[in-house]
Amino acid sequence: MATGNVIQVIGAVVDVEFPQDAVPKVYNALEVENGAAKLVLEVEQQLGGGVVRCIAMGSSDGLRRGLKVTDLERAIEVPVGKATLGRIMNVLGEPVDMKGDIGEEERWSIHRPAPSYEELASSQDLLETGIKVIDLMCPFAKGGKVGLFGGAGVGKTVNMMELIRNIAIEHSGYSVFAGVGERTREGNDFYHEMTDSNVIDKVSLVYGQMNEPPGNRLRVALTGLTMAEKFRDEGRDVLLFIDNIYRYTLAGTEVSALLGRMPSAVGYQPTLAEEMGVLQERITSTKTGSITSVQAVYVPADDLTDPSPATTFAHLDATVVLSRQIASLGIYPAVDPLDSTSRQLDPLVVGQEHYDVARGVQSILQRYQELKDIIAILGMDELSEDDKLVVSRARKIQRFLSQPFFVAEVFTGSPGKYVALKDTIRGFKGIMDGEYDHLPEQAFYMVGSIDEAVEKGKKL
């Protein structure tokens, strides 16, 4: 193995000089010996003259010029397979949960080609989530990609935790969770939530949190994806959760600036679309198995046209948009039913009844949105009888779109509810047809199925 020496350290970027005839390849892993501590670097650029520029996969504190560096002659490799289930690992696949070695039988490189055209397969099967607003308005496809878009504090992580809990309990497959640049507290909460729900032995956890160097946050999504690919290639249906894809982009921006590339729009890296494509093209289903991915996407300043969320949109099958206006009404999950979309919402896929109910709900809510200005200026009394009925039903639908979550029981004090798709369709169809016009609005707030709303209405 070739050895070189550190010649420059600038934060997370380290320049290493090797002999001219043994320059490491781009993406090779290098190991720096700094006393007892070992730091892994990843080669990003070859500068000529035997010098390579690398990104540190850990803190570069204590590094100095002249330290010996060994070329491992391979990319970063991480453990894959069943040994990773129930464990928490970092970007290098090292355990961070104090439970000893992973004991894996196989390690895979985190840089892998996307499946070829012949290997790809698409599915029309729906994945029931038990969350009314998602199942009705933006149904998920098995083996599809879903984005949860939202600004700060509107509930992306809570929605994702509820999805993981529901799917892990109702659908007995394996899941991989990649925490990319999120809060360590959330990672901790998530681990305990999974343990309490008895689904931890079906989930592999990979964390690269907010306080870690940009190299970790840029590569940790690939580490999680590699573990998911292994399960898929064994012929399984895997779930891959990434929280948060925006931090992946942001880490790329930091690395790009440190490597001296010229920034593009809004200061993002010039390779934004390519970096996103490299990750997203690997998250796909093949003829062997499927990867269904749910990705949380932070929307900077609630602006969906920002280059980062805009680049992510192109890769998704379904988008769940969380809205601050809906959250401010106290309706959780704060999903915007008029802004969320899904390719699966097609009568040929979901069936005519589901399609008609979803579109009917949207048209009632859209009409209510248009009438809001008139109500604000002139009041309800100025509306026609038909419009009054539309407003009354729209307000019931809006409240019925709320739902108590299992993972939020500690905050809401009410037990979580899982609602089957057929019950969801029956409930909204009934409200639209006027079967529940006699019930007060409050009866529909924070309940599961329509039967619970009727029961609640009797008590009010």
Curated annotation (Swiss-Prot):
One of its GO terms (molecular function) is ATP hydrolysis activity. It is found in: Cell inner membrane. The keyword Transmembrane does not apply. Keywords: ATP synthesis, ATP-binding, Cell inner membrane, Cell membrane, CF(1), Hydrogen ion transport, Ion transport, Membrane, Nucleotide-binding, Translocase, Transport. Its EC number is 7.1.2.2. GO terms for cellular component: plasma membrane; proton-transporting ATP synthase complex. It holds the Pfam family ATP-synt_ab_N. ATP binds at G150, G151, A152, G153, V154, G155, K156, T157. It catalyses: ATP + H2O + 4 H(+)(in) = ADP + phosphate + 5 H(+)(out). It is a peripheral membrane protein. It is an enzyme of class 7 (translocase). HAMAP family: ATP_synth_beta_bact (MF_01347). Belongs to the ATPase alpha/beta chains family. Produces ATP from ADP in the presence of a proton gradient across the membrane. The catalytic sites are hosted primarily by the beta subunits. F-type ATPases have 2 components, CF(1) - the catalytic core - and CF(0) - the membrane proton channel. CF(1) has five subunits: alpha(3), beta(3), gamma(1), delta(1), epsilon(1). CF(0) has three main subunits: a(1), b(2) and c(9-12). The alpha and beta chains form an alternating ring which encloses part of the gamma chain. CF(1) is attached to CF(0) by a central stalk formed by the gamma and epsilon chains, while a peripheral stalk is formed by the delta and b chains. This is ATP synthase subunit beta. It comes from Sodalis glossinidius (strain morsitans).
